[in-house]
């Protein structure tokens, strides 16, 4: 399976599918956030602040997370490569921390409930994850392990001619499309949204669990390989995420972050 990572090129400038995926994901999340703000507590200034901070958080957090967690030595030896985000190499876990920092900063600045905001963001982010994984698929990166399944694909970036799981598509569906449907169904069809933090907790639990399982079908990052108990770095980070999500969810149900909270 070989697709061009560039949509088109004009001279030395190329527009890449991976970059477009990020842009479309952010635009959709921004629009969806506005749609879900039933209490209409978000002001234009807050939206602008959150959008700017989120873009910075995604890029810095995602890129630095990848560099520091997965391949620090390589980038220390060739630091200019850190800037080449269009080649891929973005860490979801690092990006998530960046977005969390962006939300906290913007909410504190405009006195907006943090977990109310995170709950709404959790309903729109899955589409961004879907688009991002499609970008990974087009780039031919983050491919799966060798398989005999009939839907196995050959990824040139793997350096061999073996059929592999299209693990990017697994993640695109389960982390993206399926959870988008689940999160928005919970938001619109139940009263769970009244307990600020519940949707955030569910989102973190869902991602951590799905990522942990999909990692069994995904080729480990060559820079890190297998770690403790033959688990990958992605799985170890996902275990931490799942535990954190459970804590947030249970705390929300106990009304620690309920509708009476302001931050």
From Swiss-Prot:
Pfam families linked: LGT
One Gene Ontology cellular component annotation held by this UniProt entry: plasma membrane
Keywords, ordered alphabetically: Cell membrane, Membrane, Transferase, Transmembrane, Transmembrane helix
Location of the protein in the cell: Cell membrane
InterPro entries to which the protein is assigned, alphabetical: Lgt
Metabolic or biological pathway, per its Swiss-Prot or TrEMBL entry: Protein modification; lipoprotein biosynthesis (diacylglyceryl transfer)
Binding site for a 1,2-diacyl-sn-glycero-3-phospho-(1'-sn-glycerol): 133
Annotated membrane topology: Multi-pass membrane protein
Protein origin, superkingdom: Bacteria
Annotated TM spans: 7-27, 50-70, 85-105, 112-132, 169-189, 197-217, 233-253
EC id: 2.5.1.145
Function: Catalyzes the transfer of the diacylglyceryl group from phosphatidylglycerol to the sulfhydryl group of the N-terminal cysteine of a prolipoprotein, the first step in the formation of mature lipoproteins.
Protein family membership: Belongs to the Lgt family.
Protein name from the UniProt record: Phosphatidylglycerol--prolipoprotein diacylglyceryl transferase
């Amino acid at each position: 399976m070989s697709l061009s990572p560039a949509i088109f090129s004009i001279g030395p400038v190329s527009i890449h599918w991976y970059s477009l995926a990020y842009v479309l994901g952010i635009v959709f999340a921004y629009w969806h956030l506005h749609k879900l703000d039933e209490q209409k507590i978000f002001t234009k200034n807050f939206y602008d602040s959150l959008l700017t901070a989120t873009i910075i958080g995604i890029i810095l957090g995602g890129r630095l997370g990848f560099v520091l967690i997965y391949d620090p030595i390589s980038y220390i030896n060739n630091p200019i490569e850190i800037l080449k985000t269009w080649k891929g190499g973005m860490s979801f876990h690092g990006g998530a921390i960046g977005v969390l920092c962006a939300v906290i900063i913007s909410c504190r600045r405009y006195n907006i409930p943090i977990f109310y905001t995170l709950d709404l963001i959790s309903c729109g982010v899955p589409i961004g994850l879907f688009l991002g994984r499609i970008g990974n698929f087009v780039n031919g990166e983050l491919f799966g392990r060798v398989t005999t399944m009939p839907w196995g694909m050959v990824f040139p970036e793997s350096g061999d001619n073996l059929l592999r799981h299209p693990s990017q598509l697994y993640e695109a569906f389960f982390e993206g499309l399926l959870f988008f449907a689940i999160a928005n169904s919970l938001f619109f069809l139940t009263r769970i949204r009244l307990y600020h933090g519940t949707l955030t907790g569910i989102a973190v639990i869902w991602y951590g669990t799905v990522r942990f399982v999909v990692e069994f079908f995904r080729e480990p990052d060559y820079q890190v390989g297998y770690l403790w108990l033959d688990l990958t770095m992605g799985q170890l980070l996902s275990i931490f995420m799942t535990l954190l999500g459970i804590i947030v969810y249970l705390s929300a149900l106990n009304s620690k972050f309920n509708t009476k909270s302001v931050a």
